[in-house]
């Protein structure tokens, strides 16, 4: 027996909104202020990871150690503040139309994110 589809899940970053340029810039700038190197291009490679994971990868490479919980919280907080200072991300092409189509078919569109950034939740 086929089950009736009730909802469609959409990721936010890179699916509904083009926010990655802002995420990569914020990561790059915050790491730079801490004397750490994370290029904008490399930040894209870490998309989908938790902030703690990204920070620890950079700490391991640059400092040969894991970041403390305090360092993780501080750096991620700084990154979030900087990200939130940027203009609102543009919708991805076709995202609005697709959401409207989903709704017109009687389905519930739902947004999901792996982000722990409170401003996005």
Task: Give the residues covered by each predicted segment.
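Short, acidic loop-to-helix structural element flanking the phosphoryl-transfer center
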Residues: 4, 84-111, 117-121
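Conserved acidic
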Residues: 19, 42-43, 71, 87
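Short, surface-exposed alpha-helical segments at coil->helix boundaries
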Residues: 20-25, 52, 117, 121
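Active-site neighborhood of HAD-like aspartate-dependent phosphohydrolases
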Residues: 2-42
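Alpha-helical substrate-recognition element adjacent to the catalytic core
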Residues: 25, 30-63, 85
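Active-site-adjacent beta-strand anchor residues
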Residues: 17, 48, 110-114
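A metal-dependent, Asp-based hydrolase signature
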Residues: 48-83, 93-96, 101-104
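Residue-level detector of short coil/turn "hinge" positions at structural boundaries
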Residues: 38, 66-67, 109
């Amino acid at each position: 027996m086929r089950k009736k589809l009730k909802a469609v899940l959409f990721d936010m970053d890179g699916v509904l909104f083009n926010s990655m340029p802002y995420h990569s810039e914020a990561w790059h700038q915050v790491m730079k202020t801490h004397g750490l190197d994370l290029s904008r291009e490399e930040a894209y490679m870490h998309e989908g990871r938790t902030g703690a994971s990204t920070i620890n990868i950079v700490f391991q490479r640059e400092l040969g150690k894991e970041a403390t919980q305090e360092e993780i919280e501080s750096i991620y907080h700084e990154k979030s503040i900087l990200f939130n200072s940027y203009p609102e991300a543009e919708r991805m092409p076709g995202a609005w139309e697709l959401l409207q189509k989903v709704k017109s078919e009687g389905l519930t569109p739902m947004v999901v994110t792996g982000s722990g950034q409170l401003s996005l939740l």
